[in-house]
């Protein structure tokens, strides 16, 4: 016990923002018998455990009334009898969408199929027949990605399908920034792929007192018109509910003007190639003054492209001579190491929300999404507490938490008051999927080998 406490105190001098302590790369185990709640700053400050600073999940999110009224007015004036079916079809299509297959991957698959056909002695192959067989097999086994062109009609369907869920996901991301950095008061925001303008509304709900300029960029003219109507309560005239909103169809490439917050929500997946995504992420980071917020569907495809964007920024390939400050991961990762979940389940989160009260909507709903928030500066500025990556499983006298730890590893922790201390146990019990657990996870401790306690 004394040796463990000495090790904990020694490790406390290691700056948690700088990554893994130099002693070892072992799993960040929650060691029984050692109180590891991060008390160095008196984090509870006489508050109850249910209000510990790692709690970040929002209650049910609701659209601003002006936005909900505008959406209902637009839909009542334009929707046909098949709107419900169109909404369901588009929702399913967007959720199940994969990334476009890159040319190099297509060539690799074609060579593999050609080799497979040539190895079959029962097939007499001419060069023309072989080429036809390979193409036929490729068409059957390759995802056919198509670019969506948002006309006036499709933009309206998208609004009915995604306005409320998109607002909920972005609100959760913005809430994390505000909760962990309450002194941050942005004045400018740029939204790439702005669509219906849900990012602008979510940002106004969080930082409406400080934001003075919102730049909305979307290549669809019809979508920009729809977003502007929503700002005016669903009409083409009148004063916008949020002042200082500007619309344009093309992304400004000049790095001279930066925005305090830059956002891309459900837009990187709409780009036709990895090269296009790389170019856009580089441009977005150059335009970022403080925070770059990227949000996508909580699927393997969405998580994968967000990790590509994260790695691109962290490797520093897009450094601008006008702003040489490095980037670090503000959320959700408590580290800058490779994602330990990339080969398994998608790292996703869930936000409950009240949908727009259309006839087909049921209450409440959950928006499942993946996100990454990148910030300029030093990792020392961010919390390095473990992130809860799955729903917390509460059982009598113990609780299961799946954690992404600051050393870049996943841990399934089974916590009890007797083995881990009352503070840590109570904090874990009141925490939810997506929260931070205010606990020190020194990598010098060996992984816990204790078995899960009986659930009887």
Swiss-Prot record:
It comes from Homo sapiens. This is Ribosome assembly protein METTL17, mitochondrial. Mitochondrial ribosome (mitoribosome) assembly factor. Binds at the interface of the head and body domains of the mitochondrial small ribosomal subunit (mt-SSU), occluding the mRNA channel and preventing compaction of the head domain towards the body. Probable inactive methyltransferase: retains the characteristic folding and ability to bind S-adenosyl-L-methionine, but it probably lost its methyltransferase activity. One of its GO terms (cellular component) is nucleoplasm. Belongs to the methyltransferase superfamily. Rsm22 family. The gene is METTL17. It is found in: Mitochondrion matrix. Associates with the mitochondrial ribosome (mitoribosome). Residues 1-19 form a transit peptide. Changing residue 347 to S: Abolished iron-sulfur-binding, leading to impaired ability to promote mitochondrial ribosome assembly. Keywords: 4Fe-4S, Iron, Iron-sulfur, Metal-binding, Mitochondrion, S-adenosyl-L-methionine, Transit peptide. Changing residue 404 to S: Abolished iron-sulfur-binding, leading to impaired ability to promote mitochondrial ribosome assembly. It comes from the Eukaryota. Gene3D superfamilies: Vaccinia Virus protein VP39.
């Amino acid at each position: 016990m004394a040796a463990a406490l000495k090790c904990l105190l020694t490790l406390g001098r290691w700056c948690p923002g700088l990554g893994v302590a130099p002693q070892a790369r072992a799993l960040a185990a929650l060691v029984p018998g050692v109180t590891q709640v991060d008390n160095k700053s008196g984090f509870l400050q006489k508050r109850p455990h249910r209000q510990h600073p790692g709690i970040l999940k929002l209650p049910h999110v609701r659209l601003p009334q002006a936005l909900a009224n505008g959406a209902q007015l637009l839909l009542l004036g334009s929707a046909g009898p098949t709107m419900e079916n169109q909404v369901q079809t588009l929702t399913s299509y967007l959720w199940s969408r994969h990334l476009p297959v890159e040319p190099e991957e297509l060539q690799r698959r074609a060579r593999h199929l050609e080799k497979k056909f040539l190895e079959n002695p029962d097939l007499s192959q001419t060069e023309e027949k072989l080429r036809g067989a390979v193409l036929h097999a490729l068409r059957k086994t390759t995802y056919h990605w198509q670019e969506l062109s948002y006309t006036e009609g499709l933009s309206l369907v998208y609004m009915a399908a995604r306005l409320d869920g998109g607002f909920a996901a972005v609100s959760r991301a913005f809430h994390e920034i505000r909760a962990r950095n309450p002194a941050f008061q942005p004045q400018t925001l740029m939204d790439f792929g702005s669509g219906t303008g849900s990012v602008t509304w979510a940002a106004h709900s969080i930082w409406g007192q400080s934001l003075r300029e919102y730049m909305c960029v979307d290549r669809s003219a019809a979508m920009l018109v729809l977003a502007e109507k929503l700002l005016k309560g669903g009409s083409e005239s009148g004063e916008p509910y949020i002042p200082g909103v500007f619309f344009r169809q093309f992304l400004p490439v000049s790095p001279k003007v930066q925005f305090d917050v830059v956002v891309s929500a459900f837009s990187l997946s709409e780009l036709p190639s990895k090269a296009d995504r790389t170019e856009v992420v580089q441009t977005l980071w150059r335009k970022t003054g403080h925070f770059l917020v990227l949000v996508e569907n909580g699927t393997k495809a969405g998580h994968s492209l967000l990790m590509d964007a994260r790695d691109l920024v962290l490797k520093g390939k897009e450094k601008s001579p006008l702003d040489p400050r490095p980037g670090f991961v503000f959320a959700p990762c408590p580290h800058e190491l490779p994602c330990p979940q990339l080969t398994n389940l998608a790292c996703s989160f869930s936000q409950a929300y009240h949908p727009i009260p259309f006839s087909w909507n049921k209450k409440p709903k959950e928006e499942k999404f993946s996100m990454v928030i990148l910030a300029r500066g030093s990792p020392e500025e961010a919390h390095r507490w473990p992130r809860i990556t799955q729903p917390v499983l509460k059982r009598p006298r113990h609780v299961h938490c799946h954690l992404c730890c600051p050393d870049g590893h996943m841990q399934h922790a089974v916590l009890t008051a007797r083995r881990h201390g009352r503070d840590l146990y109570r904090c874990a019990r009141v925490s939810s999927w997506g929260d931070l657990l205010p606990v020190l996870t020194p990598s010098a401790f060996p992984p816990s080998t204790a078995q899960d306690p009986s659930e009887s």
